[in-house]
């Protein structure tokens, strides 16, 4: 099994090394096509608003590295904070031209540039991102006030951790405050008996989630790159692991490989669990100073060009499975292979899980670990699969499997 893995990773390593430079990220035409697909599904006289992600605080005056809202990135490609995308179901004249899409971004700020780096500003953003109209966030509130005849308002559920930045009057907090005020004003103007206004925070997530489920060829290429570098990390750990190593050291090898091959971030906190730690589904502490002569579960994924892999492997720290460990390992491997075989277009999303669960269930009975089918949940309390993409648990319909989902 290890020889096969190493052979496959040698091939992916060659592929990654053979590229002279990082392949280009998704170009503006991709995001424009996504916006058009959303616009085609919006009712007339509607407004849909999608906000950038908030800046999240780590402690005191130190923030976490910024990570864009995946839905906002999917529709714009824009990676800066404090921004809002407006999509209109009916074209509206804005500054002399009829438009259906408007992106509001911050103006350039020399003070901010000194401390944090340049921001693009409306003019450069308009040129780079192929959006009908790009305006300063200073105009967002007045734009909303100018809207007439709106009878449908769509948005994603609001973030609950948006901080007010007192020195920035046009931050995300201000944008959200203005939009919430707009909703309240429209609600007061509408007549309840006429049902003349619809405010919906489910329609837009459903529309965008269904689109995100189906990947383009370029998205699949990026995901393959993310998976390849994540798999290389697994093999590098297989070569380096020793019982005296800590979980943190193994995590460091994985994340070094991610950076080496071009990933800027992890797709989610790396899980490296030795022994009982490997039984904690979302164990991210990685605090064991020695992994010992135990099995080590490693659930890790590189985030490459905003798309994340999710690769899990379990290996013996001393390089050799015991008889009991091998029995469980091979049982899980058989379930995985059966789940892969069941993952075909037209099958129910739950089919791979049912097949894998059945094999685990019977295997545990055969090994004498459980006596009845209902006990399998003790050892298999979760689903078998999920979509991956801009999120490690990517949205989708979770209905019949579709091509390129």
Language-model features: locations:
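Residue-level detector of alpha-helix boundary/anchor positions
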Residues: 8-10, 377
């Amino acid at each position: 099994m290890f020889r096969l893995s190493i052979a496959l990773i040698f091939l992916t390593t060659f592929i990654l090394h053979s590229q002279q430079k990082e392949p280009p990220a998704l170009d503006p035409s991709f995001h424009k096509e996504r916006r058009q697909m959303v616009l085609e599904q919006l009712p007339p006289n509607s407004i849909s608003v999608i906000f950038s992600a908030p800046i999240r605080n780590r402690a005191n005056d130190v923030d976490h590295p910024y990570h864009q809202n995946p839905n906002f990135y999917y529709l714009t490609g824009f990676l800066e904070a404090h921004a809002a995308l407006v999509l209109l179901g009916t074209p509206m004249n804005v500054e002399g031209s009829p438009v259906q899409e408007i992106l509001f971004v911050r103006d350039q700020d020399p003070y901010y540039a000194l401390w944090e780096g340049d921001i693009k500003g409306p003019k450069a953003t308009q040129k780079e991102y192929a959006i009908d109209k790009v305006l300063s966030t200073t105009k967002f509130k007045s734009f909303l006030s100018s809207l007439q005849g709106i009878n449908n308002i769509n948005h994603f559920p609001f973030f609950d951790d948006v901080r007010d930045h007192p020195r920035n009057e046009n931050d995300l907090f201000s944008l959200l405050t203005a939009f919430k005020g707009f909703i309240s004003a429209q609600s007061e103007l509408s007549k309840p008996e006429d049902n003349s206004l619809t405010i919906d925070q489910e329609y837009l997530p459903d529309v965008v989630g269904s689109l995100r489920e189906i990947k383009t060829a370029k998205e699949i290429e990026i995901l393959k790159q993310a998976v390849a570098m994540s798999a290389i990390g697994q093999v590098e750990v297989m070569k380096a692991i020793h019982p005296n190593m800590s979980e943190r050291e193994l995590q460091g090898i994985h994340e070094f490989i991610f950076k080496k091959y071009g990933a800027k971030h992890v797709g989610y906190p790396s899980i490296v669990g030795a022994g009982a730690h490997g039984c904690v589904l979302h164990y991210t502490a990685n605090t064991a100073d020695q992994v010992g002569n135990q099995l080590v579960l490693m659930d890790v994924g590189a985030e490459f060009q905003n798309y994340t892999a999710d690769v899990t492997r379990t290996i013996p720290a001393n390089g050799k499975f015991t008889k009991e460990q091998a029995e469980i390992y091979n049982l899980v491997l058989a379930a995985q292979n059966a789940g892969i075989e069941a993952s075909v277009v037209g099958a129910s999303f739950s089919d791979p899980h049912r097949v894998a669960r059945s094999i685990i269930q019977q295997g545990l009975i055969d090994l004498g670990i459980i006596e009845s089918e209902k006990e399998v949940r003790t050892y298999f309390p979760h689903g078998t699969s999920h979509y991956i993409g801009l999120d490690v648990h990517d949205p989708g319909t979770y209905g019949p499997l579709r091509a390129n989902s």
